[in-house]
Amino acid sequence: MMAVVIRVGDVTERLREMPDDSVDCVITSPPYWGLRDYDCPGQVGMESTLAEHLTLMVEIFEEIRRVLKPTGTVWLNYGDCYATAPNGRSAADTKAAVADDRTFRDKPFSTVGPMLDPAHAKSVRPRAFNPITGNTRTESAARVVAGGYLKPKDLCMLPNRLAIALQDAGWWVRSEIIWGKPNAMPDSSGTRRPST
């Protein structure tokens, strides 16, 4: 019968103690970025930017690759979140207080959002006529350009971003398994379809 070993401690320290090509299977659920603060110095998931978090995750997975046998597999559980201000503070207040960009409101890592092409920013076009008020609203004809920002309430797509970062580092992403949770925590947002 095969022995199962559970290693507890800092992931980078525990992985460095392990020999190359010694693990058949890794099952991991690393801390999701910006969602839990365990009040522990250097904790994974509390990096100032998503780019720093993804860089750290790729570095950790390089150590996992080193200890994984050529026939080994990795099972990764990584959750998502929505772009919002933490604890009700605005993005500007949070950044001013702690130089922290985990609010997602003004981060240059997404290709969606309100970053507009200045060449089109001043032109406007009619959008909708309101027969009750007699007013015609206008909208900017500016175009969103690559390098834009996530908007409030956007799904951040963190698992996808991590999967792409790992693919870029040479990992294979073989499948995505949706974890159906029949008794999941209720979603009180009221502005989006529940994910379960």
Summary of predicted features, one role per range:
Residues 2-196:
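Core catalytic lobe of class I
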